């Protein structure tokens, strides 16, 4: 991914963050309401989906989000942040995918 695209996407994201903070000053009451068994079951399902072609961006993002939730539920907050960073990376790649379609 080109640095110009990364900077553009970061700028777009920061604009949306500002808008969200203005619109919803109170973000949330807790990190997740999902039960641990649900996270484990869904994570296993998405890992199977993502283990074979065709690969879909939304499926990859679902797996990354569930990995972040799992780490949070296990109390591994550093790992949770790493997984959330991976979610961000997937979202940037999704943004680039859409932009490439717009240019085609």
Predicted feature locations:
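Flexible "arm" and connector segments at domain edges
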Residues: 1-104
């Amino acid at each position: 991914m080109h640095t110009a695209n990364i900077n553009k996407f970061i700028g777009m994201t920061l604009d949306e963050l500002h808008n969200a903070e203005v619109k919803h000053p109170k973000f949330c009451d807790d990190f997740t309401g999902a039960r641990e068994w649900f996270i484990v079951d869904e994570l296993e399902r998405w890992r199977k989906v993502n283990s074979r072609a065709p690969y879909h961006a939304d499926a990859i993002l679902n797996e990354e989000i569930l990995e972040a939730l799992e780490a949070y539920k296990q109390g591994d907050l550093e790992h949770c942040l790493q997984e959330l960073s991976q979610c961000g990376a997937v979202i940037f790649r999704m943004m680039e995918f859409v932009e490439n379609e717009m240019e085609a």
